[in-house]
Protein backbone atom coordinates (compact mmCIF):
# COMPACT_ATOMS: atom_id res chain seq x y z
CA UNK A 1 0.00 0.00 0.00
CA UNK A 2 2.85 2.40 0.78
CA UNK A 3 4.42 1.68 -2.62
CA UNK A 4 1.16 2.34 -4.42
CA UNK A 5 0.66 5.59 -2.54
CA UNK A 6 4.13 6.74 -3.55
CA UNK A 7 3.33 6.21 -7.23
CA UNK A 8 0.10 8.18 -7.18
CA UNK A 9 -0.03 10.92 -9.79
CA UNK A 10 -0.19 14.54 -8.56
CA UNK A 11 -3.67 16.13 -8.55
CA UNK A 12 -4.65 17.46 -11.95
CA UNK A 13 -2.00 15.53 -13.91
CA UNK A 14 -4.49 14.19 -16.44
CA UNK A 15 -6.02 17.66 -16.81
CA UNK A 16 -2.69 19.28 -17.72
CA UNK A 17 -0.37 16.62 -19.21
CA UNK A 18 3.33 17.47 -18.97
CA UNK A 19 5.04 14.43 -20.49
CA UNK A 20 7.35 14.86 -23.47
CA UNK A 21 5.94 14.68 -27.00
CA UNK A 22 2.55 16.26 -26.38
CA UNK A 23 1.55 19.02 -28.79
CA UNK A 24 -1.48 21.34 -28.95
CA UNK A 25 -2.63 23.66 -31.73
CA UNK A 26 -4.99 26.48 -30.75
CA UNK A 27 -6.97 28.79 -33.00
CA UNK A 28 -7.16 32.26 -31.48
CA UNK A 29 -9.95 34.58 -32.56
CA UNK A 30 -9.97 38.13 -31.16
CA UNK A 31 -12.66 40.76 -31.68
CA UNK A 32 -12.66 44.36 -30.47
CA UNK A 33 -15.52 46.74 -29.73
CA UNK A 34 -14.63 48.75 -32.86
CA UNK A 35 -15.37 45.61 -34.97
CA UNK A 36 -11.68 44.89 -35.65
CA UNK A 37 -10.93 41.16 -35.85
CA UNK A 38 -7.75 39.09 -35.78
CA UNK A 39 -7.09 35.38 -36.28
CA UNK A 40 -3.96 33.43 -35.45
CA UNK A 41 -2.77 29.93 -34.59
CA UNK A 42 -0.56 29.07 -31.62
CA UNK A 43 1.25 25.76 -31.12
CA UNK A 44 2.40 24.54 -27.69
CA UNK A 45 4.82 21.62 -27.33
CA UNK A 46 6.00 19.61 -24.33
CA UNK A 47 9.78 19.12 -24.47
CA UNK A 48 10.13 16.87 -21.44
CA UNK A 49 12.08 17.32 -18.22
CA UNK A 50 15.27 19.35 -18.23
CA UNK A 51 17.69 20.90 -15.73
CA UNK A 52 17.85 24.44 -17.08
CA UNK A 53 16.84 25.88 -13.70
CA UNK A 54 19.09 26.31 -10.67
CA UNK A 55 16.23 25.07 -8.50
CA UNK A 56 16.28 21.65 -10.18
CA UNK A 57 14.52 19.78 -12.95
CA UNK A 58 11.14 20.84 -14.30
CA UNK A 59 8.85 20.10 -17.22
CA UNK A 60 9.69 22.30 -20.22
CA UNK A 61 6.93 23.63 -22.48
CA UNK A 62 7.46 25.87 -25.53
CA UNK A 63 5.14 28.08 -27.58
CA UNK A 64 5.83 28.85 -31.23
CA UNK A 65 5.39 32.52 -30.28
CA UNK A 66 8.83 32.39 -28.66
CA UNK A 67 7.87 31.75 -25.02
CA UNK A 68 9.23 28.93 -22.87
CA UNK A 69 7.75 27.75 -19.58
CA UNK A 70 8.94 25.39 -16.85
CA UNK A 71 6.38 23.62 -14.68
CA UNK A 72 6.23 21.18 -11.80
CA UNK A 73 3.51 18.94 -10.40
CA UNK A 74 3.17 17.68 -6.84
CA UNK A 75 0.56 17.21 -4.13
CA UNK A 76 -0.26 20.94 -4.16
CA UNK A 77 -1.20 20.95 -7.87
CA UNK A 78 0.43 22.00 -11.14
CA UNK A 79 2.38 25.23 -11.21
CA UNK A 80 4.84 27.25 -13.27
CA UNK A 81 8.25 27.97 -11.77
CA UNK A 82 9.99 29.93 -14.55
CA UNK A 83 9.49 31.52 -17.96
CA UNK A 84 11.69 32.81 -20.77
CA UNK A 85 11.03 34.97 -23.83
CA UNK A 86 13.18 35.35 -26.94
CA UNK A 87 14.82 38.45 -25.47
CA UNK A 88 15.82 36.74 -22.20
CA UNK A 89 19.27 35.19 -21.95
CA UNK A 90 18.18 32.77 -19.21
CA UNK A 91 14.89 31.54 -17.74
CA UNK A 92 13.40 33.93 -15.17
CA UNK A 93 12.25 32.13 -12.01
CA UNK A 94 8.80 33.01 -10.70
CA UNK A 95 9.00 34.62 -7.22
CA UNK A 96 6.37 32.17 -5.99
CA UNK A 97 4.76 29.12 -7.65
CA UNK A 98 2.32 30.27 -10.32
CA UNK A 99 -0.48 27.71 -10.17
CA UNK A 100 -2.23 26.46 -13.29
CA UNK A 101 -4.44 24.10 -11.26
CA UNK A 102 -4.37 24.00 -7.46
CA UNK A 103 -5.31 21.04 -5.31
CA UNK A 104 -7.78 19.90 -4.31
CA UNK A 105 -9.41 19.71 -7.73
CA UNK A 106 -12.82 20.58 -6.33
CA UNK A 107 -15.47 23.24 -6.82
CA UNK A 108 -14.52 26.29 -4.79
CA UNK A 109 -10.75 25.81 -4.75
CA UNK A 110 -9.17 29.18 -5.48
CA UNK A 111 -5.73 30.76 -5.84
CA UNK A 112 -4.16 34.00 -6.98
CA UNK A 113 -1.67 34.84 -9.74
CA UNK A 114 -1.17 37.87 -11.95
CA UNK A 115 -2.34 38.70 -15.45
CA UNK A 116 -2.24 41.63 -17.84
CA UNK A 117 -4.56 42.99 -20.51
CA UNK A 118 -4.44 41.21 -23.86
CA UNK A 119 -7.16 43.12 -25.68
CA UNK A 120 -7.89 46.49 -24.06
CA UNK A 121 -6.43 49.53 -25.80
CA UNK A 122 -6.45 53.32 -25.50
CA UNK A 123 -7.93 55.07 -28.50
CA UNK A 124 -5.55 58.02 -28.75
CA UNK A 125 -2.22 57.04 -27.20
CA UNK A 126 0.89 55.22 -28.40
CA UNK A 127 1.48 52.44 -27.80
CA UNK A 128 -2.26 51.82 -27.51
CA UNK A 129 -2.05 48.53 -25.56
CA UNK A 130 -2.88 48.94 -21.86
CA UNK A 131 -0.53 46.08 -20.93
CA UNK A 132 2.54 48.30 -21.35
CA UNK A 133 1.44 50.46 -18.41
CA UNK A 134 -0.10 47.60 -16.37
CA UNK A 135 2.06 44.48 -16.89
CA UNK A 136 0.93 42.72 -13.69
CA UNK A 137 -2.65 42.73 -12.40
CA UNK A 138 -3.79 40.46 -9.53
CA UNK A 139 -6.26 37.79 -10.64
CA UNK A 140 -8.20 35.29 -8.51
CA UNK A 141 -8.88 31.86 -10.04
CA UNK A 142 -11.69 29.60 -8.85
CA UNK A 143 -12.71 26.10 -9.90
CA UNK A 144 -16.38 26.44 -10.86
CA UNK A 145 -17.32 23.03 -12.29
CA UNK A 146 -15.95 19.49 -12.62
CA UNK A 147 -18.23 17.96 -15.26
CA UNK A 148 -18.57 20.40 -18.14
CA UNK A 149 -19.02 19.27 -21.73
CA UNK A 150 -16.99 21.25 -24.27
CA UNK A 151 -17.21 21.23 -28.05
CA UNK A 152 -14.37 22.72 -30.11
CA UNK A 153 -13.05 22.10 -33.67
CA UNK A 154 -10.91 19.22 -32.32
CA UNK A 155 -13.99 17.38 -31.02
CA UNK A 156 -16.30 16.99 -28.04
CA UNK A 157 -14.87 16.53 -24.56
CA UNK A 158 -16.60 15.58 -21.33
CA UNK A 159 -15.94 15.68 -17.57
CA UNK A 160 -13.99 18.90 -18.04
CA UNK A 161 -12.96 21.21 -15.22
CA UNK A 162 -13.99 24.84 -15.67
CA UNK A 163 -11.83 27.50 -14.03
CA UNK A 164 -12.75 31.20 -13.84
CA UNK A 165 -10.26 34.02 -13.43
CA UNK A 166 -11.41 37.49 -12.37
CA UNK A 167 -9.27 40.62 -12.23
CA UNK A 168 -10.17 44.30 -11.87
CA UNK A 169 -8.15 47.09 -13.46
CA UNK A 170 -8.88 50.68 -12.45
CA UNK A 171 -8.58 52.99 -15.46
CA UNK A 172 -9.69 56.46 -16.49
CA UNK A 173 -12.63 55.63 -18.76
CA UNK A 174 -13.67 59.10 -19.95
CA UNK A 175 -14.51 62.57 -18.53
CA UNK A 176 -18.11 61.55 -17.79
CA UNK A 177 -17.44 58.30 -15.91
CA UNK A 178 -14.00 59.13 -14.56
CA UNK A 179 -12.10 56.16 -13.16
CA UNK A 180 -13.77 52.74 -13.42
CA UNK A 181 -12.92 49.20 -12.35
CA UNK A 182 -12.63 47.31 -15.63
CA UNK A 183 -13.32 43.56 -15.22
CA UNK A 184 -10.94 41.14 -16.96
CA UNK A 185 -12.63 37.73 -17.04
CA UNK A 186 -11.13 34.43 -18.19
CA UNK A 187 -12.79 31.02 -18.49
CA UNK A 188 -10.62 27.93 -19.03
CA UNK A 189 -11.65 24.31 -19.61
CA UNK A 190 -9.29 21.44 -18.77
CA UNK A 191 -10.30 17.96 -19.93
CA UNK A 192 -9.00 14.55 -18.76
CA UNK A 193 -6.18 13.13 -20.86
CA UNK A 194 -6.15 16.16 -23.13
CA UNK A 195 -5.35 19.32 -21.18
CA UNK A 196 -6.53 22.85 -21.88
CA UNK A 197 -9.11 22.67 -24.68
CA UNK A 198 -10.77 26.08 -24.58
CA UNK A 199 -10.20 29.62 -23.28
CA UNK A 200 -12.55 32.60 -23.30
CA UNK A 201 -11.30 36.07 -22.40
CA UNK A 202 -13.47 39.17 -21.96
CA UNK A 203 -12.13 42.69 -21.46
CA UNK A 204 -15.10 45.07 -21.97
CA UNK A 205 -14.39 48.80 -21.93
CA UNK A 206 -17.63 50.54 -23.00
CA UNK A 207 -15.75 53.82 -23.01
CA UNK A 208 -15.05 56.65 -25.45
CA UNK A 209 -11.36 56.64 -24.44
CA UNK A 210 -10.84 52.87 -24.46
CA UNK A 211 -11.57 49.89 -26.69
CA UNK A 212 -12.16 46.47 -25.16
CA UNK A 213 -12.62 43.08 -26.72
CA UNK A 214 -13.13 39.33 -26.47
CA UNK A 215 -11.01 36.33 -27.37
Predicted regions, residues:
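Conserved functional acidic sites
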Residues: 7-215
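Sec-dependent bacterial lipoprotein signal peptides
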Residues: 1-5
Amino acid sequence: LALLAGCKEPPGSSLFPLEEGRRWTYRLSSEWENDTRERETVVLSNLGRDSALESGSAWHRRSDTGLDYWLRADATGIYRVAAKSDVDAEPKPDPTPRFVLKAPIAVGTSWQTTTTTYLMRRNSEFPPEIRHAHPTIPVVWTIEALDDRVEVPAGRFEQCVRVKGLALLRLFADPVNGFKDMPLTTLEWYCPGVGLVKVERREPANSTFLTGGTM
